[in-house]
């Protein structure tokens, strides 16, 4: 039995399971046609066009585009008749720091007994710091190959076991062991241990002076161009001096070619690298050192999450939070004569969906019994910072937050028969998606590329870390249209736009699939809004214990 068929025929079983005691008089197996009709492709396209226009300069926090964007979102929330989501305000200030960090010398030189290797900034390596120090000066730091740089007791894996890395630079592989051996970790599905953010965090906890991740396109799920673009300008972090976690003095990436040359110079064979992908690996000193000097400047400012709500009619203290990040990359490297990274798919598309879903809730015949919150969060591209700040400074109690439904990019390729759930199997939210999809004649499956760690790469993850089930859906693969020529042309036109100036709204967009996905997002939240149940994490989820503690409060 295929996964699609298995999921489709399981609808009745699932509906009879976690959702059977929902104590609602509303027919959960039907669609509110009046609400659905309020979701409109024309108004949606108009908002995407505005948010992704050159006028908004790529919507980077701390820029003119920041001010234009948050004011635009507030104006739309007001025009829709939504209530302010933070007391009398639509804004939640997010204190951040913009860190401009560059090597004093763009040439980084590694020195060893068998020679030296010099590499070029951006072409071969990228480094920076999250430490709030004007200068980072490391006269000499020895390099250690530390496997994946992972400490995971539940998987009996510790790359730092009996290893003192204080003052040293750790070189680590991208992803986690499951990427290479399906019997390890979660096989093809990346765990949080495979994320670059985790590797930086762990190196800091271990006291390393520096950490360099070896880039691999397949393991990272994106090319060196994405790394280069992401690190070529200022980086942002929360201004959190009082509760700052330990950080390495510098962090960054090296290209595959650089790593190969480095290991060759150090006399490290491929066998050693392959052994790092198996249990029992012990870190290997490279007998190579380098020196690092960074000059840093800081800009302290506040960006904003923009928040609105529709108050519930019966259980107003219980909330369902829709999120979409409003920020993108601003103005950056020029590509084909264009330097504005407009971010139409990523994520003007998600913000515009907030407005359409709000319209649907307002048009619903039966009004939501729980409060519906619409939150456009800042600084997702810089490390999920807006949602991280909210989750640590919640306006609505964590233990009364039912779920987070996160919208980050929609596919403009056209309508599909199926829909994907990123992180399928994590929580009972999956069951609501299956039931809602069934109403629209759609099937549900897991994500396209579980090796990318998508579940840990968008704003819902900050809610998940607090024990709140989070939904992150992606478009399906089974396009309904049979016009293969048009589909092929559309795919060709849209290829290569991720984090590029070419991510713009144009005639290649087919809004049919986006509207279908927005309708589904609405129906899932609407179903939850009429129930008394709190969806839980599933037994095999690493977040189940967190969820149980949250609802026990």
Predicted regions and their residues:
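C-terminal motif of bacterial Sec signal peptides marking the signal peptidase cleavage site
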Residues: 15-17
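Active-site-adjacent substrate-binding region
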Residues: 204, 215, 278, 282-287, ...
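Acidic/histidine-rich catalytic neighborhood of metal-dependent amide-processing enzymes
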Residues: 192-194, 198, 218-219, 330, ...
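Catalytic-core environment of secreted peptidases
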Residues: 36-56, 61-84, 111, 164, ...
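N-terminal capping segment at the start of a domain
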Residues: 27-31, 38-64, 80, 86, ...
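Metal-dependent peptidase/peptidase-like ectodomains
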Residues: 123, 240-270, 315, 377-477, ...
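Soluble metallo-hydrolase cores and metallopeptidase-like ectodomains found primarily
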Residues: 32, 111-115, 125-162, 242-343, ...
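Noncatalytic luminal/extracellular "stalk/propeptide" segments of secretory-pathway proteins
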Residues: 57-182
């Amino acid at each position: 039995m295929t996964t699609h068929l298995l999921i489709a025929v399981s609808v009745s079983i699932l509906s009879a399971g976690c959702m059977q005691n929902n104590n609602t008089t509303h027919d959960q197996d039907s669609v509110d046609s009046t609400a659905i009709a309020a979701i409109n492709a024309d108004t949606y396209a108009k908002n995407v066009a505005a948010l992704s226009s050159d006028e908004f300069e790529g919507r980077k926090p701390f820029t003119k585009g920041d001010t234009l964007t948050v004011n635009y979102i507030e104006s739309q929330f007001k025009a829709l008749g939504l209530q302010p989501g933070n007391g009398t305000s639509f804004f939640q200030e997010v204190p951040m720091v913009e860190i401009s960090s560059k090597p004093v010398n763009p040439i980084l030189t590694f020195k060893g007994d068998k020679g030296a290797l010099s590499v070029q900034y951006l072409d071969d390596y990228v480094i920076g710091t999250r430490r709030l120090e004007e200068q980072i000066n490391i006269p000499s730091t020895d390099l250690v190959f530390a496997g994946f740089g992972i400490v995971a007791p539940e998987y009996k894996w510790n790359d730092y076991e009996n290893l003192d890395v204080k003052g040293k630079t750790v070189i680590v592989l991208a992803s986690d062991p499951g990427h290479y051996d399906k019997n390890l970790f979660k096989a093809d599905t990346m765990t949080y241990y495979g994320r670059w953010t985790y590797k930086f965090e762990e190196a800091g906890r271990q006291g390393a002076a520096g950490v360099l991740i070896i880039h691999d396109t397949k393991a990272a799920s994106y090319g060196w161009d994405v790394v280069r673009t992401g690190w070529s300008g200022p980086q942002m972090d929360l201004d959190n001096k009082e509760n700052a976690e330990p950080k390495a003095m510098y962090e960054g990436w090296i290209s595959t070619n650089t790593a190969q040359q480095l290991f060759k110079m150090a006399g490290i064979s491929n066998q050693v690298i392959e052994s790092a992908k198996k249990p029992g690996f012990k870190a290997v000193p490279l007998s190579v050192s380098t020196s690092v000097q960074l000059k840093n400047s800081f800009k302290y400012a506040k960006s904003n999450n923009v928040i609105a709500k529709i108050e519930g009619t019966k259980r107003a203290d219980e909330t369902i939070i829709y999120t979409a990040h409003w920020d993108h990359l601003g103005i950056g490297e020029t590509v084909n004569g264009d330097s504005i990274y407009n971010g139409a798919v990523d994520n003007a598309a998600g913000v515009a969906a907030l407005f359409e879903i709000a319209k649907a809730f307002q048009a619903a015949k039966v009004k939501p019994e729980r409060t519906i919150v619409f939150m456009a969060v800042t600084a997702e591209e810089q490390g999920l910072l807006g949602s991280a700040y909210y989750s640590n400074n919640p306006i609505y109690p964590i233990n009364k937050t039912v779920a987070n439904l996160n919208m980050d990019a929609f596919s403009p390729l056209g309508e599909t028969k199926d829909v994907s759930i990123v992180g399928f199997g994590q929580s009972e939210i999956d069951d609501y998606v299956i039931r809602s999809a069934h109403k629209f004649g759609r099937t549900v499956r897991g994500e396209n590329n579980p090796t990318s760690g998508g579940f840990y790469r968008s704003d819902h993850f900050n809610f998940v870390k607090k024990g709140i089930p989070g939904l992150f859906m992606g478009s399906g693969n089974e396009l309904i249209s049979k016009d293969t020529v048009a589909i092929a042309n559309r795919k060709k036109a849209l290829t290569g736009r991720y984090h590029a100036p070419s991510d713009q709204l144009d005639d290649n967009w087919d809004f049919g699939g986006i509207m279908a996905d927005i309708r589904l997002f609405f129906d899932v939240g609407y179903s939850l809004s009429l129930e008394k149940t709190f969806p839980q994490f599933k037994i095999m989820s690493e977040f189940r214990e967190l969820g149980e503690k949250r609802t026990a409060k």
